[in-house]
């Protein structure tokens, strides 16, 4: 609880660092001739990252190869979390897949070596199933860094029973994409570049499918968050005011996973209707056309305690949020950048810092100043992107 007369200030990034990032972004847009934060309609921009030797379509002409040793292992998520916390004072968190049941049930042969779906292509599908079908017909698919290393495409590929090829992954920060099977992905890429295209054997394919199913579902990722942060209690508030109207991938996936794991224990401060299966609105207006995350939760999870987002900035709305926070054992902040002022207001109103678990889910990494502030405070932070190329 804030001391009498004191004013709590939630950790924030340096203005100078933020300004520098904006300048770099503007320079990139100028060079690309596009106002988008990442190249859109420019598949050539991303395809150039993959060796021309791997742009092979027909799988029938290729030999089979065992890419991974029989005893290949990846670090446990909780061990990676502890190592990251020791280094930066925060835990790594990545996108997750809300519907793991979509993983193909068999390792059938496929006609294509590399998927023809390339990052940067304009999105032209009206059906997610149609979009994923091309991945289902291929053994490998290109997936690159965009604004950050973490993209939903990696997961769409993996849960299609396909292996993503991620150029330059070996140069990324050790905690970027911490939850993906990075060692296996880098091993596969190295062998393809050194020995040429080949079809992965059943062991290799099964490893990636099993890893994704066990560790990359939204429920599995939520279990990691609960364990790493030590979340306990019968009432856990999920705070993200903007999510009710605008998608933030990491916040949405985390909320989905927590509700899949803990059910009605999770109380959204502001209900996110498009995540519930009785939503009747147009999901295609949402980010990514709503593919993969809309209408995935049973409507029975709708919380009667959630507040009206339209009233959030009124005096009455702020009082209601404080009352809800006081009634909860833990507060998970799904989009810290978008809710930082609300966090400050709640702490200054008497909610203990230690009750907050905050998620930094944007492409913008926390700078040294922010990390130092986080280390000094009592809130727990999860971070999606880390320093590096």
Task: Provide a role label for each language-model segment.
Residues 115-119, 123-242, 249-262, 266-272, ...:
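Catalytic binding pocket for nucleotide-activated donors in carbohydrate/polymer assembly enzymes
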Residues 98-102, 125-126, 138, 220-224, ...:
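A Trp-anchored, charged/polar loop motif used as the substrate-binding/catalytic surface
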Residues 62, 107-109, 136-138, 160, ...:
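Residue-level preference for short coil/turn positions at secondary-structure junctions
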Residues 39, 43-44, 104-119, 231-246, ...:
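Short hydrophobic beta-strand segments
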Residues 18-117, 179-192, 199-205, 209, ...:
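N-terminal accessory regions of S-adenosyl-L-methionine
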